[in-house]
Design a protein with these regions (language model features):
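Conserved SAM-binding motif I beta-strand of class I
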Residues: 27-35
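Conserved SAM-binding loop
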Residues: 44-45
Length: 265
């Protein structure tokens, strides 16, 4: 089979996965890594070259969508790193938050989601649908990712048949846009430091926003996917039998320790 990982980071998941497939006796025909960063691709190659399990697999690097294929697609913390829009509730309606310059510094600037924004169909359409039956207080700030429709459509064009697994930070829409979550979820990460000011060290920080999983399901459905559902990572791991695997690993470790003590007695 084939596995396509989108945004593979340093290659850690790829190396571990190939090791597990080898232990199970089901090696992959091809492991494709889609990453546009030359620096990250070099790190991934270095990591996989040091992995014995990767030696028998055709590891391929891509900087764009592959040719149509059948297999599994995996992405970890991918959707939350996509470009996002930010909005502010004012007088009971959402205003678009953009960026302005004030006294030589970058600042947030709010403007109505009509008039100049009237042609921005993605912004207006999403908020009209998402907030149709959700009441948010003035001053509330939130984020959403407008690119999900295009992304799933592109993925659907190359995936003939298979499964897509996406692990990300996020919540279903009603929980994400909760009236008490007034400052949104925009976060910035730089050298193991986290903060919420994207204007601090611009261009150096990784900017993320939590994912509206309801929007993910809607976009996937529009692109022709059948959505199996979404769950927490804890429930996913427990459902996959991680407790039994942990117990088996502990039993193996105990047997090994016992054999070692007998041998040295």
């Amino acid at each position: 089979g084939e596995l396509l990982e989108i945004g593979p980071g340093t290659g850690g998941f790829a190396a571990e996965s190939l090791g597990i497939f080898a232990l199970l006796g089901t090696p992959l025909q091809r492991y494709a890594l889609l990453d546009t960063s030359a620096d990250m691709r070099a790190r991934q190659r270095e990591r996989l070259l040091a992995s014995p399990a990767a030696q028998g697999t055709d590891c391929t690097w891509l900087d764009g969508w592959p040719q149509p294929f059948t297999g599994v697609v995996f992405g970890n913390e991918l959707l939350d790193a996509m470009p996002c829009e930010r909005f502010l509730m004012r007088d009971g309606v959402p205003w678009r938050l953009g960026v302005g310059l004030e006294a030589g510094r970058l600042v947030w600037r709010a403007r109505p989601a009509d008039g100049a924004c009237a042609g921005d169909d993605a912004f207006v359409r999403y908020l009209q649908s998402a907030l149709a039956d959700i009441s948010l207080p003035d001053g509330y700030r939130g984020e959403f990712h407008p690119g999900f429709d295009a992304w799933f459509a592109a993925l659907g064009a190359v995936l003939r048949r298979g499964t897509v697994l996406l692990a990300d930070y996020g919540l279903p829409r009603r929980q994400l846009f909760h009236p008490e979550r007034t400052m949104g979820s925009l976060r910035c990460h730089y050298r193991h430091r986290a903060h919420d000011d994207p204007f601090l060290w611009p261009g150096l920080v990784d900017v993320t926003a939590w994912v509206d999983f309801t929007a993910v399901a809607e976009s996937a459905t529009r692109a022709g996917f059948e959505v199996a559902g979404f769950t927490t990572q804890t429930a996913f791991l427990l459902g996959g039998g991680i407790e039994a695997q942990l117990a088996a690993a502990q039993a193996d470790a105990s047997d090994t320790d016992s054999d070692s003590s007998h041998a040295s007695a």
